[in-house]
């Protein structure tokens, strides 16, 4: 299968609630690489690379609200060029 990369911008109550940590856990379980980081506007950027079905599962998890402590209002997803990440990290 072909590797794909996406950037997802997650809006709502997603900072200070363990969102990046839980996203890292979910992405790692799906075998994805990339990162999650807080943005200045209160959203979280998730860049994920891997097999299309696994990336789709992460996007579905994000759209379904992520961790229970978060409240996701909307998720914008954009395709990205291939990138070579080692694992899935939290960026600061």
UniProtKB/Swiss-Prot annotation:
UniProt-listed PROSITE patterns: ACYLPHOSPHATASE_1, ACYLPHOSPHATASE_2, ACYLPHOSPHATASE_3
Catalytic-site annotation from UniProt: 20, 38
GO molecular function, one term: acylphosphatase activity
UniProt xrefs under Pfam families: Acylphosphatase
The protein's Enzyme Commission number: 3.6.1.7
Occurrences of domain Acylphosphatase-like (ranges): 5-92
InterPro entries the UniProt entry points to: Acylphosphatase, Acylphosphatase-like_dom, Acylphosphatase-like_dom_sf, Acylphosphatase_bac, Acylphosphatase_CS
Keyword tags: Hydrolase
Domain of life of the organism encoding this protein: Bacteria
Gene3D superfamilies, sorted: 3.30.70.100
The reaction(s) this protein catalyses: an acyl phosphate + H2O = a carboxylate + phosphate + H(+)
Family classification: Belongs to the acylphosphatase family.
NCBIfam families: PRK14426.1 (NF011000), PRK14451.1 (NF011022)
Protein name: Acylphosphatase
Gene name for this UniProt entry: acyP
């Amino acid at each position: 299968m072909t590797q794909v990369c996406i950037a997802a911008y997650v809006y709502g109550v997603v900072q200070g609630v363990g969102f990046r940590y839980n996203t890292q856990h979910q992405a790692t379980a799906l075998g994805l690489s990339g990162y999650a980081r807080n943005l200045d506007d209160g959203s979280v950027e998730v860049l994920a690379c891997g097999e299309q079905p696994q990336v789709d599962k992460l996007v579905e998890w994000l759209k379904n609200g992520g961790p229970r402590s978060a409240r996701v209002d909307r998720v914008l997803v954009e395709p990205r060029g291939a990138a070579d990440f080692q694992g899935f990290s939290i960026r600061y």
